[in-house]
Amino acid sequence: MIAIIDYGVGNLFSLASSLKSLGLETKVTRDAAAIRAADHIILPGVGAFADAMAKLEATGLVPVIKQEVEHKPLLGICLGMQLLFEISYEYGEHTGLGLIPGEVCPLADDLKDPSLKVPHIGWNRLDIVPGRENDPLFKYTKPGEYVYYVHSFYAKNCAANTLAASEYSIPVTGAVKNGLVYGTQFHPEKSGDTGLRMLRAFAEL
């Protein structure tokens, strides 16, 4: 069973629907016992980092998540991926879950092409880091496939844990990994067949 953590941030319907379309047992929950019973965990999220982190802490699930990722796979999606990092500079300075080394910073501050818009919205090519092609998350993914992004902040100073990136005048971190903890800045559930294949690969970890 895949537990989708519901902590009041974002619409979880499309993610749950995508997983169910693959025939995967899914449960949207904020119950610690259900998360402990799950085989896999997904941490979704849209919106502001500080608000999301506060809501996640209010559920009491932070210690549960940190315990469970020691022996089962977790996938953070979009803001959920950003929460995995140590710190975010989104309208201030905020502490994250600290499951992946690195920081989350404003995309607009680093873009080399001022004509590019922020948020970064739409399809972009996912370039897998050389040597990472055989990661289990990419079991059904070919280098250069396109995925769907919607974000204004991005993870940086995390090269050792980066699996893939997309070009947006700078390399934008697209997927990360630390042990059993995975994250995608893009939305697999909005990335068509490519995203579905990646979700299937995650479910097989």
Explain the meaning of each model-derived region.
Residues T26-V28, V104:
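Generic structural signal for residues in well-ordered beta-strands
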Residues I2-L24, E189-K190:
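N-terminal beta1-alpha1 ligand-phosphate binding loop
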Residues A34-I35, E68, A175:
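Structural alpha-helical scaffold elements that stabilize or flank donor/cofactor-binding regions
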Residues A38:
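An anion/phosphate-binding loop that grips the pyrophosphate of nucleotide cofactors and donors
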Residues I42-P44:
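Structural motif
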Residues F49-I121:
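Cysteine-nucleophile active-site neighborhood
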Residues E103-L205:
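Amide-donor transfer/coupling interface in amidating biosynthetic enzymes
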